[in-house]
Amino acid sequence: MQGHHQNHHQHLSSSSATSSHGNFMNKDGYDIGEIDPSLFLYLDGQGHHDPPSTAPSPLHHHHTTQNLAMRPPTSTLNIFPSQPMHIEPPPSSTHNTDNTRLVPAAQPSGSTRPASDPSMDLTNHSQFHQPPQGSKSIKKEGNRKGLASSDHDIPKSSDPKTLRRLAQNREAARKSRLRKKAYVQQLESCRIKLTQLEQEIQRARSQGVFFGGSLIGGDQQQGGLPIGPGNISSEAAVFDMEYARWLEEQQRLLNELRVATQEHLSENELRMFVDTCLAHYDHLINLKAMVAKTDVFHLISGAWKTPAERCFLWMGGFRPSEIIKVIVNQIEPLTEQQIVGICGLQQSTQEAEEALSQGLEALNQSLSDSIVSDSLPPASAPLPPHLSNFMSHMSLALNKLSALEGFVLQADNLRHQTIHRLNQLLTTRQEARCLLAVAEYFHRLQALSSLWLARPRQDG
């Protein structure tokens, strides 16, 4: 019993000495437990040759042998640790700091680490290679916060007024995209038509085209002037072909507008069809402006119209005031404000028509006076003086005749303004019925002309 107590006391003293020795090694920054087991085998072999005074006790030798048996065998001798144990890692890495600060002190087993040290090494090694869980949790928490903030940005109000306003905004955005798409398609179709028209003009001027059984743009001349059917120029013939295409496109657009009106579409959707028809009419105004610069007589004569339409022709087109009378009965019921606006528009349109008619009449009278000779020259008068008098009168008449183009352009401008001002006074559905009524009016005039030309004729 006393021997056992003495051995235990000797073991504690040896442990304290070893602990102080371990602290000394910890201060130097290295741990003897990190030394390769081969070194312990070497030192153990040297211990058998030491004098008996320095030989370790049997109990110490037993613990050393047990620790060596628990360490895994290795084939290399690595007496230097992977990194100094006393170096503190940077504060940014929390998990590495915790693993480094676990500097094991010497255990009571002597100069070697206890049996629990290998498990500690394995635990630290696994913690070193294990990905940081804190950053993942922080990232997940940040994602949850981001989702919460994004959910917070989405209005979750149950107010009916707010929900209705949001629905209206979405519907308006959708209609805006549809209008933009239709506008782009219209621009593309206009570009294609313009390219085709330019190609036809070049082909008509270079090769000549057949129109109504006669050659246009070729070498047919009369008095040094190129002629076609009815003495029209090549530009006028191209305008007639383009006008025929315009009529076909107008019929297609009106059919779409009629279907849209019958389907009871919304105001925004119906507005798209109305704007398309108005833009198509503006295209005709541009075509007439181009041909007016080259052959204004073709527009005034109405050669591009049907016979029944020529009876109502006024300065190369229809009278705007007559169109207002046609559509008034087709767009009822009207409000009091609309009736007042339409009456005022009709009165101002009639005044403008009267002013243009008086101006054109004055121009015709002046033109007639310019070409009338003051007196007939005598039969014995020489030809050159008579020819010079003729050329002076023709030059004066040409200067006055150039104003005829301005009258036609002003009349087309009045027609354009009347239609657009009338549409401003009406609702979208009334505008649609207005366009359909005008188209039906001209369609009946064209049908009347066809019936007149196809009527049976009596001989004699």
Curated annotation (Swiss-Prot):
Q: Where is this region: Leucine-zipper?
A: 187-201
Region described as Disordered: spans on this chain:
1-29, 43-163
Q: Where is the composition biased (Polar residues)?
A: 65-81, 121-136
Region annotation Basic motif: where it falls in the sequence: 161-181
Major place of residence: nucleus
Record's Gene3D superfamilies?
A: 1.20.5.170
Give the observed phenotype of the deletion mutant.
In the double mutant tga9 tga10, reduced male fertility due to defects in male gametogenesis, with early steps in anther development blocked in adaxial lobes and later steps affected in abaxial lobes. Microspore development in abaxial anther lobes leads to the production of inviable pollen grains contained within nondehiscent anthers. In addition, multiple defects in the anther dehiscence program are observed, including abnormal stability and lignification of the middle layer and defects in septum and stomium function. Reduced SPL levels in anthers.
Explain the induction of this protein. Answer: Strongly induced by flg22 in leaves.
**Where would I look for the motif Nuclear localization signal in this sequence?**
163-170
Please give the InterPro entries that the UniProt record associates with this protein.
bZIP (IPR004827), bZIP_sf (IPR046347), TGA_domain (IPR025422)
Q: Where is the composition biased (Low complexity)?
A: 12-21
Free-text tissue specificity from the UniProt record: Expressed at low levels in inflorescence apex and flowers.
List residues of the DOG1 domain. Answer: 236-455
Concerning Pfam families, the annotation shows: bZIP_1, DOG1
This protein's UniProt keywords: Activator, DNA-binding, Nucleus, Transcription, Transcription regulation
Q: Mind listing the GO biological process terms from this record?
A: anther development; DNA-templated transcription; hydrogen peroxide mediated signaling pathway; response to molecule of bacterial origin
Q: Where is the bZIP domain?
A: 159-203
Composition-biased stretches (Basic and acidic residues): 138-162
Which Gene Ontology cellular component terms are annotated? nucleus
* Gene Ontology molecular function terms on file: DNA-binding transcription factor activity; protein homodimerization activity; transcription cis-regulatory region binding
Subcellular location field? Nucleus
Feature: compositional bias, Basic residues:
1-11
Q: What protein family is recorded? A: Belongs to the bZIP family.
Q: What is the purpose of this protein?
A: Together with TGA9, basic leucine-zipper transcription factor required for anther development, probably via the activation of SPL expression in anthers and via the regulation of genes with functions in early and middle tapetal development. Required for signaling responses to pathogen-associated molecular patterns (PAMPs) such as flg22 that involves chloroplastic reactive oxygen species (ROS) production and subsequent expression of H(2)O(2)-responsive genes.
Complex formation? Homodimer. Binds DNA as a dimer. Interacts with floral glutaredoxins GRXC7/ROXY1 and GRXC8/ROXY2 in the nucleus. Interacts with TGA1, TGA2, TGA3, TGA4, TGA5, TGA6, TGA7, TGA9 and PAN.
Q: What is this protein called?
A: Transcription factor TGA10
Which organism is this protein's natural source?
Arabidopsis thaliana (Mouse-ear cress)
This protein's encoding gene:
TGA10
